[in-house]
């Protein structure tokens, strides 16, 4: 079967935003207008097509990224293929956003017209910047009380440091919002309410908005001609670009991430969605417009590129593992190059294992269609892959490549969990391991001494939902302990240790001597190992054993057994024995050497500090600040946002549990907050003593 749509007619994009900015509703409208849904699903009814897990429908938030394929006829009458990924906006699910941005070519960033740029918008924005994802902005909820399009434009500049190119102006706002002015065509689009937004009238720009439309069209042209010398020269000579030229320049600037085209509307009231779909075609990249993906040759380790071309060797990236109640385990993958056929096999180059391509599916939210083959640019779901986990590369066994791996954040909160009955024990193990395979920001560990199982994640909601899914999907009843903070330890001083490991007990003995300098790593929180051995005091083949030995004890620090951060180790000398030395002997020696050093190098306890943002009416500002200070918070600043005040602070995670209940009672339910992990910070000594006393008893 040949390719149905040319690769230049593909648009792989995601919809990203703060929680409650209307992502799922916007996606629902897109599916409705592109003909994939016969009725519009509303989030507040629990009927949205993309929110298919039970908890999502109950809580009205999107938890897992649902992928869907749909089609849209552009302004030129040509059909385009859209692969859309709906991403969660709650900060506990940031990992889902990170995964989807990694495999997308473009994104629509949604803003709530009332709130503008919110904390999670900034978090998601930073992730999109990291992967250099071209974006457009849709200022949603223009019908909401307090909606202010122009404030949102300003916030994009001040809070995101980005340049928004305004493509439309709103006609009216709040309950008076009727439609938009198209600044390229210079006409107005007014939607007919009775048609569920399917029909609109193109009319003259209202007289009271003509001057504003002229002003913003001028700004639009000024911004876009800057990226093209010829267009700039013409403009300075009084020659204006025509509409096609403006669109071409907007497309180029968007793909090069020089600026962001900005649109407005209200998805809930069905206004502004179709022009947004036309803009996806006009301005977001096809797989051909983005740079070829880089990878490492599996055999030679040389850097190679894979282009978006069916004739190139197959390469794809697994970006999500999901358990489907009907199909079983599903691996979602983005095909970057080549062609994938049912019945063939691929190699997982990260695990060095072969996987058979059995059932291959194209997904529409939670319904599915079996397909026989897929091509470069496609997003597919593969059934029954046993070895593959998130971030793995799958490719042609004859031309193996390892694509760039994804980076995942460390969990900041952990909870002790115990099955209620012996029969639940095995099921719980299976459930936790499956969750860990699906979600790399979730970790499971068992304390060797106490036998207690802990699981760690990105926040209370993240862990609540995991327990809930375990109960629903695996029928496991478990007792859950109070949340615990994922503390870390580090060293603050330089220490040099000389350690000899010697064991003689008949037969082959063990011998290894290491001299190592331990100090804080000036480059950050990672572990850094360096060898300055000259003259073969420690043979080259034993040096990896030294590194491995130190790494094996970094998981349990000297103060309270927490993992260690920010350590640098430099091997400067050592000795070996021709017969008795081995990699294992050097591993044992370096392990003991580090344990000695950790006691003397000024070990320090670190705690996760959260960036907290509270949005509150002015009446409660004093109470909110006083409360944050009492939680060991450091106020970073405050600013006005409409009729509310936004307070920013860094607060230890340990002092933020159940904060939402306090904030509600303090503000009579009128204040809201959000928090994201910011950095690790030393724990004050009086608090550190309490923590050590509490955890040393458990370890």
UniProtKB/Swiss-Prot annotation:
UniProt key word NADP: no
One MF term from GO for this chain?
GTP binding
Q: What is the annotated localization of this protein? A: Cytoplasm
Q: Which residues cross the membrane?
A: none
A single GO CC term, please?
cytoplasm
Ranges for the tr-type G domain? Answer: 8-288
Residues annotated as binding GTP: 17-24, 86-90, 140-143
**Main localisation, per the record?**
cytoplasm
The source's domain of life comes to: Bacteria
Keywords linked to the UniProt accession: Cytoplasm, Elongation factor, GTP-binding, Nucleotide-binding, Protein biosynthesis
GO BP terms: namely: ribosome disassembly
Query: According to its UniProt record, which protein family does this protein belong to?
Result: Belongs to the TRAFAC class translation factor GTPase superfamily. Classic translation factor GTPase family. EF-G/EF-2 subfamily.
Please describe what this protein does. Catalyzes the GTP-dependent ribosomal translocation step during translation elongation. During this step, the ribosome changes from the pre-translocational (PRE) to the post-translocational (POST) state as the newly formed A-site-bound peptidyl-tRNA and P-site-bound deacylated tRNA move to the P and E sites, respectively. Catalyzes the coordinated movement of the two tRNA molecules, the mRNA and conformational changes in the ribosome.
HAMAP family for this protein: EF_G_EF_2_B (MF_00054_B)
PANTHER family linked:
RIBOSOME-RELEASING FACTOR 2, MITOCHONDRIAL, TRANSLATION ELONGATION FACTOR G-RELATED
What is the protein name given in its UniProt record? Answer: Elongation factor G
Which species does the entry assign this protein to?
Answer: Rhizobium radiobacter (Agrobacterium tumefaciens)
Which gene carries the instructions for this protein? Answer: fusA
